[in-house]
Curated annotation (Swiss-Prot):
GO molecular function: asparaginyl-tRNA synthase (glutamine-hydrolyzing) activity; ATP binding; glutaminyl-tRNA synthase (glutamine-hydrolyzing) activity
Family the entry assigns: Belongs to the GatB/GatE family. GatB subfamily.
Name of encoding gene: gatB
The protein's name: Aspartyl/glutamyl-tRNA(Asn/Gln) amidotransferase subunit B
UniProt GO BP: glutaminyl-tRNAGln biosynthesis via transamidation; translation
Reactions catalysed, as given in the entry: L-glutamyl-tRNA(Gln) + L-glutamine + ATP + H2O = L-glutaminyl-tRNA(Gln) + L-glutamate + ADP + phosphate + H(+); L-aspartyl-tRNA(Asn) + L-glutamine + ATP + H2O = L-asparaginyl-tRNA(Asn) + L-glutamate + ADP + phosphate + 2 H(+)
C-alpha cells in the first residue's frame, strides 16, 4: 500500500522585546538562573499582568507580512496545566480569538517548484520556564528567567507532505521573522523552535490519520530526521497490525529516534477560559496601517528584484537574500564596486562566504567590510588587477593588511598592461619552449593555453590575460 504523509507545524518564535509580555522583567538570554523573574512572572498573589504593546506590534507586523487578517479584537485566555516550570499553574495564551488569522507562505521544493503552505493562525502567549537536569545530583532544577517571555505561536495548515517540505517551510519562516526583526531566530538559545504534528494515511484517502506531536525540535536537521523516523515508525506499526496512538513524542538526537512522552492532550483538557485580569486587545485600523508602513522589503520581493535589477539567476538571488543582513551586504558591495552586480555576486557567494564559513564567523564579525570587497571588485573591473591576483589581495584583506588599493600598491600587484613588457615576456616563453611552438604551428591549437599560463607565471599573475592572449596569437600565427 502507498502511504501519504500529512504534517502541520507549530512554530514558537520568541519576540525580540526587551521586557516580558506581561511584566517589566528583562528578556536577555544567559542571566544567572531566576535573576530575571519578577512577582508577575512567578504568579505571586495580588499582582496583575500588563500587556506589552511591542509584542502586539510585532505580531501584527508578522500577520501583515503573510497576508493574514489582523483581528480587530482578540482575547487572552488561561491554559491550565501543571508543570514545575509553570509557576502560576496556567499559561496566558490566546485560544478562540487569536490576533492573526489565515495567511500563507510559499516554499521552494527540491525540483524548483513552488508550493503554497497555508497558515491557520498566529497567537500571542507567554513562554514557560526551563527545567534543568544537569548538575543537580539526580534532581531537576527550575530556571524561571524565561517565564513570561513573549512568544508568537505560528500554526500551519496540514499542507506539508514530507520532512523536506517541513524543513523548507521552517527555513522560510525563520528567514521571514529575522527580516521583520521580530525574532533573532537563535535556535541554540531556544528563540525559534518547532513542534511537528505527523500522521500517515493511505494515498488518495481524505480522512486524516491519528497524529503524533513531536516536541521542541530546535534545528532544521532535527526536524527532518525526526519526521522521517516518525513516518517510518507509524507505517511499520500500521502494517504490522498495530494502531497509532495520539500522543506527544520527544526526538532523541543521539539515537535518531522518537520516544513517547505522554498521551496527547485535547484542547478541553486545558480548560481554557478568558483571563479575567486582561482586557480584550482592540486594534483600530490606524494602528494596523502604521505597522504596515514599517514593513521592510520582504524576502520574496527582494529576490525577484535582484533577478530583475541585477540580472542574477533565481538561484543566486535566493542565496543572497537568504538573510536580510547578507542581502544588505551584497547591495553595499554592488554600490561600492560601481554597479558590477554579477561579479559582486560571484565574490560574495564564493570567496567571501567561503572564508566566513571556514573561520566560523557571523557576517557582523567579518574582517572584510562590504565597502572593501566592493573596491576590490572595482579594481578587477578597471583592470588594475586580474581575477587571479584579486584572490591574493582578498586573502591579505581578510588577514587585516588593509584596504585593497593599499595592498595592491604595497605588494606591487598592479596588472601589467604595457604592450612592450608583455611582448618581452612572450618572447622569453616562446624561446624557452621551441618544441611546443613547433607543435602549435603543426595544428595543436590547445597549446595556446599552455603558453598563456607560462606568460602569466612569468609575470606573477600581473599580465593582462586578454592582452597576453591577443599578442601570443599574433606571434604564433605570424
Amino acid at each position: 500500500m502507498e502511504w501519504e504523509t500529512v504534517i502541520g507545524l507549530e512554530i514558537h518564535a520568541q519576540l525580540a522585546t526587551k521586557s516580558k509580555i506581561f511584566s517589566g522583567a528583562a528578556t536577555a538570554y544567559g542571566a544567572e538562573p531566576n535573576r530575571q523573574a519578577c512577582a508577575v512572572d512567578l504568579g505571586m498573589p495580588g499582582v496583575l499582568p500588563v500587556l506589552n504593546k511591542g509584542a502586539v506590534r510585532m505580531a501584527t507586523k508578522f500577520g501583515l507580512a503573510i497576508g493574514a487578517k489582523i483581528a480587530p479584537r482578540s482575547v487572552f485566555a488561561r491554559k491550565n496545566y501543571f508543570y514545575p516550570d509553570l509557576p502560576k499553574g496556567y499559561q496566558i495564551s490566546q485560544y478562540e480569538l487569536p490576533i492573526v488569522e489565515g495567511g500563507e507562505l510559499w516554499i521552494e521544493l527540491e525540483d524548483g517548484e513552488r508550493k503554497r503552505i497555508g497558515v491557520t493562525r498566529a497567537h500571542l502567549e507567554e513562554d514557560a520556564g526551563k527545567s534543568l537536569h544537569e548538575d543537580f545530583h539526580g534532581m531537576t532544577g527550575v530556571d524561571l528567567n524565561r517565564a513570561g517571555t513573549p512568544l508568537l505561536e505560528i500554526v500551519s495548515e496540514p499542507d506539508l507532505r514530507s520532512a523536506a517540505e517541513a524543513a523548507a517551510y521552517m527555513k522560510k519562516l525563520h528567514a521571514l521573522v529575522r527580516y521583520l526583526e521580530i525574532c533573532d531566530g537563535n535556535m541554540q538559545e531556544g528563540s525559534f523552535r518547532c513542534d511537528a504534528n505527523v500522521s500517515v494515511r493511505p494515498k488518495g484517502e481524505e480522512k486524516f490519520g491519528t497524529r503524533a506531536e513531536l516536541k521542541n525540535l530546535n534545528s532544521f536537521r532535527f526536524v527532518e530526521r525526526a519526521i522521517n523516523y516518525e513516518v517510518e515508525r507509524q507505517i511499520a506499526l500500521i502494517e504490522s497490525g498495530g494502531t497509532v496512538v495520539q500522543e506527544t513524542r520527544l526526538y532523541d538526537a543521539d539515537k535518531g529516534e522518537t520516544r513517547s512522552m505522554r498521551t496527547k492532550e485535547e484542547a478541553n483538557d486545558y480548560r481554557y477560559f478568558p483571563d479575567p485580569d486582561l482586557l480584550p486587545v482592540e486594534l483600530d485600523p490606524t494602528f494596523i496601517e502604521e505597522v504596515r508602513e514599517t514593513l521592510p522589503e520582504l524576502p520574496d520581493e527582494k529576490r525577484a528584484r535582484f533577478v530583475e535589477e541585477y540580472g542574477l539567476s533565481d538561484y543566486d538571488a535566493g542565496v543572497l537574500t537568504a538573510t536580510r543582513e547578507l542581502a544588505e551586504f551584497y547591495e553595499s558591495v554592488v554600490t561600492e564596486s560601481g554597479g558590477f552586480a554579477k561579479r559582486s555576486a560571484n565574490w560574495v557567494q564564493g570567496d567571501f562566504l567561503g572564508a566566513l564559513n571556514k573561520a566560523g564567523l557571523e557576517l557582523a564579525d567579518s574582517p572584510v567590510t562590504p565597502e572593501m570587497l566592493g573596491r576590490l571588485v572595482a579594481r578587477i573591473e578597471d583592470e588594475t588587477i586580474s581575477g587571479r591576483v584579486a584572490k591574493e589581495v582578498f586573502e591579505a584583506m581578510w588577514n587585516g593588511e588593509g584596504e585593497p588599493d593599499q595592498i595592491i600598491e604595497a605588494k606591487g600587484l598592479k596588472q601589467v598592461t604595457d604592450t612592450g613588457a608583455i611582448e618581452a615576456m612572450i618572447d622569453e616563453v616562446l624561446a624557452a619552449n621551441p618544441k611546443q611552438v613547433e607543435q602549435y604551428k603543426g595544428g595543436k591549437d590547445k597549446l595556446l593555453g599552455f603558453f598563456v599560463g607560462q606568460v602569466m607565471k612569468a609575470s606573477r599573475g600581473k599580465a593582462n590575460p586578454g592582452q597576453v592572449n591577443e599578442l601570443l596569437k599574433e606571434k604564433l600565427d605570424s
